[in-house]
């Protein structure tokens, strides 16, 4: 499998996954990294049921309040929402900023209010690093310390 993440990226993501695991408790488990085809990093599960999908991002450049928005690939967010809707489980974005881990739930409804533009990495590694981006208001994130999972069962 081709990977676009360095060992440092993988280690940082695992640290965030471990912090999420500590926050949600023992009955809910954080999965190992999902295959690249999912476009989303992890699921949270309880017994055999998926209770949430989660995308994890890490930045060592920005502090939480440095900008009004956190920008991320529109395709990645759409995929997370699609997985969430198809499994009746919420989709979350967790970002490890320089000053802490913050998390937000993203739905199709709230996404309609987010600005969409063009952006991405300034130094291209592969074709497609510049792409449609969605800007999620920082005000919608909460500190992981204050996070509780919205478990939805059908």
Segments predicted by a language model, with ranges:
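Acidic-basic catalytic patches of nuclease active cores, encompassing PD-(D/E)XK
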Residues: 1-34
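Non-catalytic C-terminal interaction segments of nucleic acid-processing enzymes
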Residues: 2-4, 18, 22, 45-48, ...
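Active-site metal-binding core of divalent-cation-utilizing nuclease and nuclease-like domains
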Residues: 26-48
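Short His-Asn-centered micro-motif
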Residues: 32-33, 56-57, 94-97
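Short connector loops at helix/strand junctions that flank enzyme active sites
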Residues: 37-39, 49-53, 86-88
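Conserved catalytic cores of phosphodiester-cleaving nucleases, focusing on short active-site segments
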Residues: 42-44, 49-63
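Short beta-strand-loop-alpha-helix junction that forms the active-site gateway
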Residues: 56-77
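Mid-chain, well-packed structural core segment of small domains
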Residues: 82-94, 98
